[in-house]
């Protein structure tokens, strides 16, 4: 029985038994940490070797005919538009001076997942890596190995050949996570708006994250989408009611997200993104007006710390990160005006803002970004108008590949919010146009 038939049989058995919840994919893992635990992890600088566009010579049944590969701290990510698939891998030099690249692959909307193990074919490249060097790729660079199904040791041939460099994307195009790595109905093993899901989002293609901000009874901004604590989002015997009616202690003490994660505060989220990832920014979706002032204070404090960090004598310590307060409704706009006045009265620098529903207000409010819904169309004239005033455009929320293609080609935006980061990254690399850098007017 093949893997797909096996999963179908499991689903039928579950239905026959009267199961109440949907199936969940188990995230595969090598026994005892695989070969990575036997080697020395490649440094961040060495991982850039793997970035580029690849031809899939063997294994196209899983990854399609081509892949985009990007890296982040400790991670090599294989990204494709086939079934929104991705592979999250680590890389290490083994004692015999071979370089292994291994981890897992997954289709987030399906129950299909498996292990991946690849090898750097060119021995001279592997030797250079093991000697601490940071070689660059060319068209002779290849990776070969195998992929598997479930937790089975990989046995199906996989061969990748580097073909060209990636288009510029860092600082240009913002593949923006829709409150996490996947949608709530997916099978990624991490809940929307959790620290775990935002960490995973970077590993599957995102370089900005949109997160939802609400306020507790005692005025603490927390990450939560809905006003109420529904069973589809949280678990906990005493986890009931509305976010706004609970103190942060009650919320964190009584509630967990679907996969057991703690509900983070905005401060925890921002700290994690800055300190643990290479995210370039955060799109802070203000769900209620009451969240605006305390959120603005946190962002202003972070910006002050980053400014000091970026002005010291150590350029390797620099960290470029922009968190923008998203003005989503007239209620939030009024709260934004009040927050600005309060911060200015206290001598605090007002943080950047993003306006969702009117491009003219982006300009008049002095915001750094426009965040229109995709349902109003690609609006290339408005995209250009705000660009001429130094602002960028990030559309929300597009998960269908055909619409991604249309918006990439017609609007040339600086970003799109999506729950399909791997597909968006691949499509930007294959058919997108590199937009001007934020702040450029030409």
Residue ranges and their predicted role:
Residues 15-18:
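C-terminal motif of bacterial Sec signal peptides marking the signal peptidase cleavage site
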Residues 20-442:
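Phosphate-group recognition and catalysis centered on beta-loop-alpha active-site segments
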Residues 1-7:
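Bacterial N-terminal signal peptides that target proteins for export
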């Amino acid at each position: 029985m093949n893997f797909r038939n096996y999963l179908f049989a499991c689903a039928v058995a579950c239905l026959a038994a009267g199961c109440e919840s949907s199936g969940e994919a188990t995230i595969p893992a090598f026994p005892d940490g695989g070969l990575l635990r036997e080697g020395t992890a490649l440094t961040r600088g060495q991982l850039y070797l793997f970035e580029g566009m690849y031809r899939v010579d063997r294994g196209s049944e899983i990854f399609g005919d081509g892949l985009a590969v990007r890296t982040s701290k400790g991670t090599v990510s294989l990204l494709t538009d086939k079934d929104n698939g991705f592979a999250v891998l680590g890389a290490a030099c083994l004692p015999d001076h071979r370089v292994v690249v291994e981890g897992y692959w997954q289709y987030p909307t399906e129950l299909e997942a498996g292990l991946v193990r690849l090898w750097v074919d060119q021995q001279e490249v592997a030797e250079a890596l093991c000697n601490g060097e940071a070689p660059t790729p060319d068209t002779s660079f290849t990776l070969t190995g195998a992929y598997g199904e479930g937790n089975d040791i990989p046995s199906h041939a996989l061969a990748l050949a580097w073909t060209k460099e990636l288009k510029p994307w860092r600082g240009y195009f913002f593949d923006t996570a829709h409150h996490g790595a996947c949608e709530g109905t997916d099978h990624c093993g991490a809940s929307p708006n959790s620290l775990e899901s935002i960490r995973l989002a970077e590993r599957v293609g995102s370089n900005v994250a949109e997160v939802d901000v609400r306020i507790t009874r005692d005025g603490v901004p927390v990450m939560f989408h809905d006003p109420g604590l529904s069973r589809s989002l949280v678990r906990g015997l005493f986890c009931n009611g509305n976010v706004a009616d609970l103190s942060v202690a009650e919320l964190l003490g009584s509630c967990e997200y679907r996969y057991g994660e703690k509900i983070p505060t905005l401060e925890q989220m921002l700290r994690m993104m800055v300190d643990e990832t290479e995210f370039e920014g955060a799109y802070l979706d203000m769900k209620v007006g009451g969240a605006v002032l305390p959120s603005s204070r946190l962002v202003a404090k972070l910006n002050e710390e980053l400014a000091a960090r970026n002005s010291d004598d150590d350029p390797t310590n620099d960290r470029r990160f922009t968190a923008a307060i998203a003005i989503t409704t007239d209620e939030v706009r009024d709260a934004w005006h009040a927050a600005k006045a309060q911060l200015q009265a206290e001598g605090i620098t007002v943080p950047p803002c993003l306006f969702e529903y009117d491009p003219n207000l982006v300009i008049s409010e002095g915001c750094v970004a426009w965040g229109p819904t995709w349902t109003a169309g690609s609006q290339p004239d408005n995209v250009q108008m705000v660009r001429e005033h130094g602002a960028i455009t990030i559309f929300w929320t597009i998960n269908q590949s055909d619409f991604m293609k249309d918006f990439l080609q017609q609007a040339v935006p600086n970003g799109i919010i999506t729950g399909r980061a791997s597909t968006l990254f691949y499509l930007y690399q294959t058919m997108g146009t590199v937009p001007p850098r934020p702040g450029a007017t030409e």
